[in-house]
């Protein structure tokens, strides 16, 4: 029996040791994650307070590693070091635990030396003598462990995000275009200072109209319309960071109303609020017969199946019912979605289920993530995706799948030919050094539009360019050329401008990462380090389309019938040169190089507050309509009223432009568009073929930017 008992005790000891090792390894893995590193703190505390010797010290090292790993990226060291946040967190954990294990090895090795044993015994005596009473010793342990806890809390917890859900402003959203006499739905939301819906809001609202003749902008005083009666909102008794999920029979800060406007023109619904004592404007509503509709969407976001937050069901609900989008694409990273069991199939199923023709359009999409040549969000107009997603991921052994965009084009060729589906590949965050776009891989069949603005910043010009007013995250070194959209246009690429949120926080169409609500305890949760380093508000894309179906929305994107805005605002913009508007090849052909070009821009500004909504201000409608020609500022035209039509005549010759050999980099016998490119080019081929291109950017004094174009002008043969 004694032998059996000894073997049993030995087995138990080994099993217990293995369980401890597995638990410690789980803690080390948790320490690398965003916010959920608190699990590592708990596991570290378990070892620190429940074990002795090396396990006790290991518990403290684990908790300290988790705290330091959080502080690294969240205090900006990822930007200082240039190390990607996830890799920086992993490096900090590895170094911290590695140093502790190295200390253990040294301790074991030196334990054979008498002088070292005497030294450590004396040191313990000095340290423990003041803490000899049990209670005092326990208090000292607690205080010691509070160091990593406090370090972790300092960057991971924001009490205001937890408790401050107080009403701050109202947001009024309506369709951009309706027919005279048609009843339509509009939404009134109350936001807190983090732009989340305030569950506490209980104000009374009343409705009125402010109307203007279209396109002249003269005020309309006799308007036939039916607006809702006064209404008192019912709020929850407690704050919520996701009020739209509450199911308590109350409004919880969000309600839909119905209205009808019979008089043609541009109209703003004004909502007077008893709680804040202010009036708020809706977006402009164009009431006109026989016009194309304007629909709003977000076509580049990420959720829980890759490196974002929120399930597909949550994403589609938020996009449709909270952000009030007309179309939306959840575009998970191809290499990450493959890691989850059946994730791709579930994503396709959820996307197709959320599609409601005439009400809400979902587009299947997937992101090709190649840090060497740039990212492409691939979207499709059908109900299927390629069986092998677009993947480039050497860090998980998938690098050979599609090593360059050339293989991506082959995959899209095969898929569209075999299914009849159409595809677009959308370049984005083109000027961010980590993901810089290499335009030399351009494919005109799939690359027709490019992301001009998102939570990563502005891509119209390189961040150091004098016409780059907003900048970007992680900009390249000063003087870097050839990564902006303007640079691509100067090379002769045919690209139009769209915007998206690139939401990683589970709020498509209205990303909250530019507010303090990026913290990990803001729902929906995530393990990924992808929502704290995006200080810019997410953008939206508007399309001119005949109807709300996948085919019609996709066709509008493919045919460049679109414009973009830098936040949740929804202005009306119409841009023509000699009567030619955006769409198709967006090209005006003139008789001669000296033919005058009459540029007209009709702008109806959105009266909503711009992001971030930290300070209330009544709209003063001050903005500048900028006309950019071939990458230079041709004209700046001020406006100071809600609806304005501005005109400018360009009498300069049609010359075209080029990227220029001087902007290329010569390396090992070949030219490249910049030092980041690995695909040789012929500098003499980087030109517009004699075409001039024009872009309109609206710069509002409140910080909102809107973009439309380009339109190209060429001399007819």
Placement of each model-derived feature along the sequence:
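Conserved, mostly hydrophobic/aromatic
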Residues: 300, 362, 452, 557, ...
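C-terminal functional module detector
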Residues: 35-36, 40, 75-93, 100-103, ...
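A metal-dependent hydrolase metal-coordination microenvironment
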Residues: 264-266, 274-275, 279-280, 288-438, ...
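Internal/C-terminal transmembrane anchor helices
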Residues: 132-157
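Membrane-helix interface and helix-disruption motif detector
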Residues: 13-17, 24-43, 48-58, 72-91
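Acidic, His- and aromatic-enriched active-site or binding-groove loops in soluble protein domains
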Residues: 353-357, 379-401, 442-460, 517-535, ...
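Membrane-interfacial, low-structure loops and terminal tails that flank and connect transmembrane helices
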Residues: 2-10, 111-136
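Membrane-interfacial interhelical loops
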Residues: 3, 61-91, 116-125
